[in-house]
Amino acid sequence: MRIFLRTIPRSLKLGLMLSACVLTVILTSALVALAIKAAFFAEEPFSNVCKTHACLAYSHRLRSSIDDSVNPCKNFTRFVCGGWQKANELSVWEDQFKSVLDRLSKTLSSIQVPPSGQNEEQRAAAVYRSCMAILEGSRDELAAVRKALDDAGIVWPQPSRDADVLRSLLYVAMKLGWDVLLDFDVVTHGEGVELVASIGKLFLFVVKKHERLRASRGGHVYFDFLKERFRRNDTDSVTYEQMKNFETYALQVVKYSRGRAAAAHRVESFLDAPDLGLTEAKWRAVLQELDVSVAARVSVTSTTPEYVESILRVWRWNGSDSFHTFVSWCTVQAAALFANEALIHNYYDTDYETTKAYHGLFCVTRAMYFSIQAPFARYNADVLKGNAGEVARNMTLTVRSAFLRRLSNWTYFDESVTVVGNWSSVATVFFNFERHSGEGGTEKRLQLPDATDSFVDNWKLSALFKRPQEVEDTMQSVYKLNYHIILYGKRDFQLMPYALSYPLFDSRLPSSLNYGGFGSEVAKALGSLFLYSYSNVSESQSMIECMREGGSIDAGQRHAERTVGLGALVDAYDSVARRASDSTVHGLEKYSGLQLVFIALCYVHCRGQASKGPGEPVCDISLRHVPEFAEAYGCAPGDPMNPPNRCPLL
């Protein structure tokens, strides 16, 4: 070789040496890349490869969503969701609900509803159909809505003059079921009549619309459309600027007063406020006009007294006429959803499919008020075929046990603090998947008239009885697309009736995918209960403050709830994988079981192109604080998903 090199010209010799160096660099880079890829996707031995229909469908979903060009240690959300967001308008979350609603609609439409003698399921089906008929244009009840508003003393868009605020508030709640600002439950006992005031059942719809209009700046069009449909003649009307300014101001006053329900106590300022025309004699007169017999004294209590007090402040600071106009504006917005197809589209202001999905949710929740289980009874009978219920319950117990172990080992653990009432029972968790008689309503509900084709008339029936607060909270959670509801009084959580839906859960999927989807919801619910129970402990507040990452306190709370139980989720999956080796999914063999847990966890949070709000890497915010994630993907110290400083968790 030395002889050969001596015979080569110097320039050529340098060129060969340079080429050798370049080749060495290329080979080294390739080896490093392969090593990194191997670290990301280190295979674990699987007992078998799942090729069931559920597995193949899920594999197709993930493979079309995962963007392999993205380093999961740099941006895990984009790694998992890049493909989905490019190809879909709706989020995975919304897409799942759309699928659930399609199945529910077919089920409810197949139920035979007799004109009389209806049972709970038949009445719920009739309410749902009458609601959907408005959206589909087969019924128009604008005339009935306007008549009902007239009966309540609401003349919007005309400004209110010398209006009876108390009568309108009580009438829309007790006769129409269109309570927005305030709802009232009448409790009669030996001492007289007790009115329990609470946040209106339709308040959420006004708040959500206000938030969307603030983001889209389409308020003037929305206002004008309502004004033209509800205007009675050519008399003067309120302006868009007047209503926008008052609504913005009022919601700022009341929004910080919507705390969790407390034990009911008296609100004397509502019963006796002469400057607002409120006296016990006035309450008696209005109640008697609304067919409520008042033999003795009247009292007003509330489980949300701060909210009620804030409503009174808005009333007092602006006078009865202005406040009545605001009450009217809120009521008209809610009543429009009962009127006709055009007004429904004006409210949602989006494409037909999205409107159909969200109004379908509205209709389902209206039916749930009459029977929280009936709309989902047949749906869940299909979902829970085979061993699905047993698998879901065992998963829930496994995650609860792992969470309790972590909690017990926490430095600040306090045996006197109850996070979960009974760790070994899931009766409350799966309450909505069991048949129950009575469902906790009042006796009046057993004597309800039969439902008809009129949605307006059907919804008036809701004012004849009062459901427990947790039922109303469940309805609100369904409309918010939540998978569970926290029952603080019972120190537990309750799954929504659709929580065991694909792709969140399917008993035919490997444990990794079910723990990443359904299991993460169980962990999140337990995280919420933990933070609530330890809210007076500074260390739990430090978790929330750390998870804010410069955002709002509410954002920090949400991120902390989602994150605090993820270590327990990993423990739960590991315990299952050790007992019986997990299966992999055909087409996803390169991912380990734990990697699939994190992928499935993130996938259900993938946003679509139409998603509102900041495009933050929602999965990264939580998973960067979970050391098991960095270990599973071999993330180098200092990578975005393996930071030097993590938030303190359990």
What residue spans do the PLM features occupy?
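Helix-loop boundary elements of multi-pass alpha-helical membrane proteins
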Residues: 1-26
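Membrane-embedded alpha-helices of multi-pass membrane proteins, especially ion channels
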Residues: 27-38, 528
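Ser/Thr/Pro/Gly-rich low-complexity linker/stalk segments immediately outside membranes or between
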Residues: 35-54
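Active-site-surrounding "flap" and adjacent substrate/cofactor-binding loops of secreted or lumenal enzymes
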Residues: 53-55, 71-74, 79-142
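Hydrophobic/aromatic-rich, well-ordered segments within soluble, folded domains that form packed cores
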Residues: 65-86, 213-230, 566
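Active-site-proximal beta-strand/loop segments in catalytic clefts of secreted hydrolases
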Residues: 79, 200, 496-498
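Intrinsically disordered, low-complexity linker/terminal regions across diverse proteins
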Residues: 97, 101, 240-243, 252, ...
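Noncatalytic, helix-rich "gating/capping" subdomain that lines the substrate-entry/channel surface
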Residues: 108-404, 434
